[in-house]
Curated annotation (Swiss-Prot):
One of its GO terms (cellular component) is cytoplasm. The gene is xylA. This is Xylose isomerase. One of its GO terms (molecular function) is xylose isomerase activity. Homotetramer.
Length: 434
């Protein structure tokens, strides 16, 4: 057990009037929301990288955090795990997520790095068994090391492709051994800086082949979790191939993988792509590929991925509304891909930030459930398209021809007039539930 969070009590639900930073006002794990316990609807997870591996640096300055587990040995990695599971206990979160590089030290060779990962997987397995905590998803860091500066799957060097594939295998093995519910692929540097030295077609084929290899290996080892792709439009490269949900679905369809792979959608990445979070979730729901979410927020003025903790209940409510419309999470969940500001140095800051974020999500979920159960918003949406239920409209949609439409307009003197969309009234309706 770690003493890093000494003096911080286990966080429990105390109700809306609670004033402590270490009490839940809205998140009550056992409260029933649309037929499920709130814990089972939200499926909260802590991100290992931001909470325990990030050192507080930025492009203009070095680390600001001084954590006792910062170091390059297995002892440091085990100390980090001890602190992590103590935090999971305090917050009573059921899940966590990691990249391989977050949980193990880098070795002098691939074999040594793999051995370090295997040692830490054994240690995390012991921690899981003792605590009851579970792995929501694992993934491979294929972007930090200099070998990946031109990408991993899309690298012009086949040796880098092979090294990345081998690394993914070790991470899938780790995720499988720990009972992970999903395996995530984020194309950290799968993109380009300039078209002057880029073969777009070749790199797309390479990315498709890598993903097919991942799917094949999933079935070979009997991994029953979901393979998830995470879209992001830019940063760190100028243009990322996995730009947004629509782009990734096109990619999956091209390689026949749309029934094998779903999406892990991040709020901050949606904003970078010029979309709202709910837009990306709704589109993934329509495509049948909504898998899991990374919950955070961006600074709307800065223009880059700030990974702040969520604090906007109306935004979060609209996101969970789309998730509930999809039937809720299956293997996915709500991972806090969120980090402290570099001036927030204290252990208590890390706990308080997650407590507040969990409350925001719980409040948003309850508002979303009220909207969906009430049914008025869906009824108004349905009414807007009522004309399409007419037999003539259905026939037009299911096999109509341009010449038939032309004849109909000419014969009837058709002159359709616009109907109000009522957006302001719909926004007022949504506000009633918040």
């Amino acid at each position: 057990m770690s003493d890093f969070f000494a003096g911080i009590p286990a966080v429990t639900y105390e109700g809306p009037e609670a004033r402590s930073d270490f009490a839940f006002r809205h998140y009550n794990p056992d409260e029933m929301v649309m037929g499920k316990r709130m814990e089972d609807q939200l499926r909260f997870a802590v991100a290992w990288w931001h909470s325990f591996a990030w050192e507080g640096g930025d492009p203009f300055g070095g680390p600001t955090f001084q954590r006792p587990w910062f170091g390059d040995t297995l002892d440091h990695a085990r100390a980090k795990a001890d602190a992590a599971f103590e935090m999971f206990r305090i917050l009573n979160v059921p899940f966590y997520c990691f990249h391989d590089a977050d949980i193990r030290p880098e070795g002098a060779s691939f074999a040594e790095t793999t051995a370090n990962l295997e040692a830490m997987v054994d240690y995390l397995g012991q921690k899981q068994e003792a605590s009851g905590k579970r792995l929501l998803w694992g993934t491979a860091n294929l972007f930090s090391h200099r070998r990946y500066m031109a990408g991993a799957a899309t690298n012009p060097d086949p040796d880098v492709f092979a090294y990345a594939a081998a690394t993914i295998k070790t991470c899938m093995d780790a995720t499988h051994k720990l009972g992970g519910a999903n395996y995530v692929l984020w194309g950290g540097r799968e993109g380009y800086e300039t078209l002057l030295n880029t073969d777009l077609g070749r790199e797309r084929e390479q990315a498709g082949r890598m993903l097919q290899m991942v799917v094949d290996y999933k079935h070979k080892i009997g991994f029953e979790g979901t393979i998830l792709l995470e879209p992001k439009p830019q940063e760190p490269t100028k243009h990322q191939y996995d730009y947004d949900v629509a782009t990734v679905f096109s990619f999956l369809s091209e390689f026949g993988l749309q029934d094998e792979v779903k999406m892990n959608i991040e709020q901050g990445h949606a904003i970078l792509a010029g979309h709202s979070f709910e837009h990306e979730l709704a589109l993934a729901r329509e495509f049948g590929i909504l898998g899991s979410i990374d919950m955070n927020r961006n600074d709307y003025q800065s223009g880059w991925d700030t990974d702040q903790f969520p604090n906007n209940i109306p935004e979060v409510a609209l996101a969970y509304y789309e998730i509930l419309r999809a039937g809720g999470f299956d293997t996915g969940g709500t991972n806090f891909d969120s980090k402290l500001r570099r001036q927030s140095l204290d252990p208590a800051d890390l706990i308080a930030a997650h407590v507040a974020a969990m409350d925001v999500c719980a409040a948003g979920l309850k508002a979303a459930a009220r909207m969906l159960e009430d049914g008025e918003l869906e009824q108004r949406r349905e009414d807007r398209y009522a004309g399409w239920r007419a037999p003539s409209a259905e026939a037009m949609l299911n096999g109509g021809k341009l010449e038939d439409c032309f004849a109909h307009v000419m014969e009837t003197g058709l002159d359709p007039q616009p109907v109000s969309g009522g957006q302001e009234r719909l926004e007022a309706l949504v506000a009633r539930y918040l």
